[in-house]
Structures are given as structure tokens and as C-alpha cells.
């Protein structure tokens, strides 16, 4: 399993180091463990540096999964509520892509007017316009670790042994591309 908290801490730290203080968030659905963990990473970092998270700049995906359409709708809502945010951290790359498209249609240029960060590093994120800064989680490594654990369980079962519960976390990595830059100066 990817260390979601570490991933969002890296993402918000990147925005913070670029001078962003008015950061909008599109959270994942509450029912997903990933969403809870990612939000915890944001809160932990914000508390550590004294960054105020404005409740008006926090929206949540309502369905079980993110959709491009909902990403657009939530970004439109953020722009209506509080258009002065300088950065947006999205639950995933699909939502980030929708946010970029919506902001561009509204006349806000990414990253000049608003930096955007996603999460997952799906293959197409490098080809978005602009290429998306995102948190990479290695699905290959997660898959191979899962396969190793299954093999261990099979061997243990064949040998009539029990194994203690095991929990492995895969470290994510922030991939900085062209959707982020220094916060605009007012």
C-alpha cells in the first residue's frame, strides 16, 4: 500500500515552498481509506507550519469514484466561492486534469495564475497541457510486494504455519512538472 500521508505531505510542502498560502483542495470520497489518509497528510503538514486551511476552499468528491465531470463542477464551485486561491491540490490526476481545463476555460492560466497538483501519476499526466505535477505511486512495486506476500502465505499454509499480520508501505515520490510555479505576487 502506498504511504498516502507522505504523498500529500510532499505535495503540499512543494506548494508551500513555492509561496502558496491560499490553497484549495478537492478531497476524495470519505468512504475511501486513501482519501482519509491523504487528508491526514495535508492536515499534519498544515499544522506543523501554521498554514491555515480555509474551509471555503475544501470540497469533496461525492460519489464512490472521481469523475472528470465532477472535477469540473467542484472546480467551478471553488472559483465561485473564493476565486483568490493560488494553488489547488486534487485527490487524483483525473480531478487535477478537470481542474486545469475548468480554470483555463474561466481565463485562469495554469500555472501562472494557479498551480495544480494531482496524485497517482497516471501515464497520461505527463502529456496534459501543462504536464501535471503529481505524486507518483509505483503500482508495479505495490503489485510485486502483494505477490510476494501471497507467495509467503501459500508457503506458510503448505507448511501448516501461521504468519503474523504484515503491513508494507510503498514510499511515493513527488514528480514536479509544469503545472506548478511560484505563487503570484499580489
Where are these regions (language model features)?
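Short polybasic/polar patches that bind polyanions
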Residues: 16, 47, 104-106
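Flexible loop/turn connectors
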Residues: 74-185
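Residues that mark the start of a beta-strand
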Residues: 20-22, 86-87
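Short acidic donor-binding loop at the edge of a beta-strand
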Residues: 14, 22, 149
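Hinge/beta->alpha junction and helix N-cap segments in small-molecule ligand-binding domains
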Residues: 1-10, 26-74, 89-97, 119-121, ...
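Alpha-helical recognition/docking segments in bacterial nutrient-uptake
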Residues: 1-13, 17, 79-80, 84
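Short acidic capping loops at alpha-helix termini that bridge into adjacent secondary structure
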Residues: 21-22, 53-57, 110-115
Amino acid at each position: 500500500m502506498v504511504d498516502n500521508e507522505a504523498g500529500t505531505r510532499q505535495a503540499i510542502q512543494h506548494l508551500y515552498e513555492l509561496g502558496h498560502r491560499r490553497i484549495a483542495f478537492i478531497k476524495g470520497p470519505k468512504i475511501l481509506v486513501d482519501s482519509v489518509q491523504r487528508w491526514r497528510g495535508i492536515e499534519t503538514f498544515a499544522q506543523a507550519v501554521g498554514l491555515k486551511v480555509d474551509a471555503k476552499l475544501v470540497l469533496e468528491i461525492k460519489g464512490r469514484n472521481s469523475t472528470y465531470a465532477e472535477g469540473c463542477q467542484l472546480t467551478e464551485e471553488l472559483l465561485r466561492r473564493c476565486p483568490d486561491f493560488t494553488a489547488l491540490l486534487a485527490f487524483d490526476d483525473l480531478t487535477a486534469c478537470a481542474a486545469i481545463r475548468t480554470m483555463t476555460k474561466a481565463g485562469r492560466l495554469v500555472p501562472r495564475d494557479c498551480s495544480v497538483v494531482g496524485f497517482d501519476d497516471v501515464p497520461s499526466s505527463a502529456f496534459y497541457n501543462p504536464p501535471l505535477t503529481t505524486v507518483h505511486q509505483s503500482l508495479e512495486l505495490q503489485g510485486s510486494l502483494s505477490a510476494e506476500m501471497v507467495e509467503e502465505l501459500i508457503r506458510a499454509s503448505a507448511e501448516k504455519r501461521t504468519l503474523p499480520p504484515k503491513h508494507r508501505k510503498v514510499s511515493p515520490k513527488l514528480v514536479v512538472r509544469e503545472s506548478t510555479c511560484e505563487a503570484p505576487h499580489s
